[in-house]
Amino acid sequence: MTSSHAMNITPLAQLALLFSTLLLPGTQALLAPTTPDAGSALNLTFDPWTRTLTWACDTAAGNVTVTSCTVTSREAGIHRRVSPFGCRCWFRRMMALHHGVTLDVNGTVGGAAAHWRLSFVNEGAAGSGAENLTCEIRAARFLSCAWREGPAAPADVRYSLRVLNSTGHDVARCMADPGDDVITQCIANDLSLLGSEAYLVVTGRSGAGPVRFLDDVVATKALERLGPPRDVTASCNSSHCTVSWAPPSTWASLTARDFQFEVQWQSAEPGSTPRKVLVVEETRLAFPSPAPHGGHKVKVRAGDTRMKHWGEWSPAHPLEAEDTRVPGALLYAVTACAVLLCALALGVTCRRFEVTRRLFPPIPGIRDKVSDDVRVNPETLRKDLLQP
């Protein structure tokens, strides 16, 4: 039976206690170096956690001068040379060690060239260690790791996972408590110490003997799995559809050029062929309205242009044509407002006319005593005027 544990940052005060526990007999949680030359004059030792090779400065060999250190692993493709600092060599770059490495030290003894070698091996029976270690950063906030129990693992095997940053500090740790079932999953909720690279190692312990470890060095950007794009909207008119979205939240710092998007729309009819369009450096896409109108859905997913992997699809959104008809209630309200405005305008106009007439009454005309007399016949008056 397997189980999963959450990983948390281990306080420094508890780190020493953990190391002393790991060094108890019968455990193999701590990677231990081995050397075929126990009588080496330098007494070489290698710390896999810090990638530091040390030796005794006060050797019995006399005047010893170390000029360089080299680590080699043909299986892992490792070949690095560094210069010593004091009585140690530090291999700055992280490296996977489960294939085993050979450490060579070059120098002089009393002026004569000398060479020393230390072999670091992965102790334990083949197939006892974990396999298929995979880790992912999801939702821009937590690290999820999983592995598979080794095919030849002892019945009482218990696995532990450690995640270290490039300086050798613990980012997270997951261990099975005594009596718990074997664990093959872990989740780390605090990634504040995680840098651009991470060293992942799954160790095992068993009362039956040593258990091989499994480790890997990964670029943290390669671990991130993008979530679905945010704020996806879709609308159509009689000729075109428009889809817009926002990039997903990310743990790593990404720019607009780092994103690419894939837009897919498909009819709801069984057996219909989906249409896909790749969008780069944009968060909007317009395309002709698919026929027949209605019954289509669209979804969007994001990808990292550098890591060449795609994230999760957004929920499907229907592609529906916008209703261009004016609602009846809105039409009634607009008509009522127009009538009211006309009535108000007419009322204001009439009132202004009445006020103007009162302020400026009409000037009466000059009356003619003869022509304006209603008792005078106009025809008779014309004849009288025309007579000489």
Curated annotation (Swiss-Prot):
Q: Where does this protein chiefly localize? A: membrane
Q: Can you cite a GO biological process for this protein?
A: cellular response to granulocyte macrophage colony-stimulating factor stimulus
**Pfam families, from UniProt?**
IL3Ra_N (PF18611), IL6Ra-bind (PF09240)
UniProt-listed Gene3D superfamilies: Immunoglobulins
The signal sequence is: 1-29
Spell out where the chain is glycosylated: N43, N63, N106, N132, N165, N237
Q: Where is this motif: WSXWS motif?
A: 310-314
**Residue numbers on the Cytoplasmic membrane side:** 349-388
Fibronectin type-III domain location: 228-324
Q: Which PROSITE patterns match?
A: FN3 (PS50853), HEMATOPO_REC_S_F2 (PS01356)
Protein localization: Membrane
According to Swiss-Prot or TrEMBL, what is its membrane topology? Single-pass type I membrane protein
Print the keywords alphabetically.
Glycoprotein, Membrane, Receptor, Signal, Transmembrane, Transmembrane helix
Q: List the disulfide bonds.
A: none
Q: In the record, what terms sit under GO molecular function?
A: cytokine receptor activity; granulocyte colony-stimulating factor binding; granulocyte colony-stimulating factor receptor activity
Provide the Gene Ontology terms for cellular component: membrane; plasma membrane
What is the role of the protein in this entry?
A: Low affinity receptor for granulocyte-macrophage colony-stimulating factor. Transduces a signal that results in the proliferation, differentiation, and functional activation of hematopoietic cells.
Subunit-structure text = Heterodimer of an alpha and a beta subunit. The beta subunit is common to the IL3, IL5 and GM-CSF receptors. The signaling GM-CSF receptor complex is a dodecamer of two head-to-head hexamers of two alpha, two beta, and two ligand subunits.
Report the domain remarks: The WSXWS motif appears to be necessary for proper protein folding and thereby efficient intracellular transport and cell-surface receptor binding.
Q: What is this protein called?
A: Granulocyte-macrophage colony-stimulating factor receptor subunit alpha
List the source organism: Mus musculus (Mouse)
